[in-house]
Amino acid sequence: IFRWIWRRMSDAKRIKLEGRERPVIVTHSGTFHADEALAVHLLTKLPALADAELVRTRDPAEIAKGTVVVDVGAEYSPSAHRYDHHQRGFFETFDAEHKTKLSSAGLVWKHFGKDILAAHMQCADSDERIPTLYRKMYDDFVEAIDGHDNGIPLYPGISDPPAYRSRTDLSSRISFMNPRWNETWDDAD
């Protein structure tokens, strides 16, 4: 029965502090990128990691001490909370419908996104809104970070449709500040 319960627990509920007073999130040192910056930010939205210490290193001994490790260590192992995407043979995608290879941000969202939403919305992770928001957040935000970090062009060929949505560019940000076509607005604004 324990295995049955364990398999049904979310990844966020499996985080163990292993005698530590404070959890540790580890990522690589040096130049930072959007994928691990987002991955770390998302992880700190989980109650178990809200006050986590951030360690930036490439030292294997320090990496091994991490409660959760993202974007470093050449290991993808959800059961050990290791979320790197740089190793050979890694081709994990969000689900069967998506083709974009996940970055550390996508891996964190895939494994913790529903728990992050539930914590943010202060609702049960079984709330009926969670699956829709989980998918929408990936499609409209996280996937573009995955694509960019993995060097996947938005337009693979001249006549190809976009490989993923990119709604975080400057034009999109400005567009989001304008009223929608069906909203009333005052031209003086």
Task: Indicate residue ranges for each PLM-predicted region.
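Hydrophobic helix-and-loop "lid/oligomerization" segment in the mid-to-C-terminal part
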Residues: N182-D189
